[in-house]
Amino acid sequence: MLHNVLIAVDGSRNSRRAVEYAGRVFAPNPEARLVLFQILPAISRMNLDKEEIKTIDSRKVERPDLAGLYWRAEDEDTMNKFFGEAKDLLVQAGLKREQIKSKFGVKKLEIADAILQEAELGKYDTLILGKRGLSRVREFFLGSISTKVVREARGCAVVVVE
């Protein structure tokens, strides 16, 4: 049975656990489609040199949703390294590489809102994310990404992995 799964990651230990969980649960399903998704922080174009701007602009040709946004190349490199490790974990769990994709966004919304928007636009059946390590006091005042996603997600199952 076709099953679309969005795994929201940030390179943390808890997002690695979310990837491991997804591998255990969805490896038996040859029709599962898993997408690793990360939000990079947006920065001002003024903080980049001409070569960095040129590199980022060339990457945006295929991604009109990123028009006008800029990010640090080293953040993208770190993300791509994690994506590679996560894909390897999923393959080791029994998934085929063709079942796994990766995608990123650049923060123009709050991270939770960006995850929710991607989940809705991609029509995912399941959304998996790791629990963040906020203290109870900070979580009470600020909320957390996982709390907001659980509260506001519609039309999909949400799994928060600790």
Model-flagged regions — what are they?
Residues 1-68:
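Small/aliphatic-rich secondary-structure junction motif
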Residues 4, 117-162:
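Gly/Ser-rich helix-loop-strand patches that form or flank binding pockets
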Residues 35, 101-105, 159:
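General small-molecule cofactor/ligand-binding pocket signal
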Residues 62-74, 99-100:
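Short glycine/proline- and acidic residue-enriched helix-loop micro-motifs
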Residues 75-85:
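Low-complexity, serine/threonine/proline-enriched polar segments
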Residues 84-126:
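Structural beta-alpha unit
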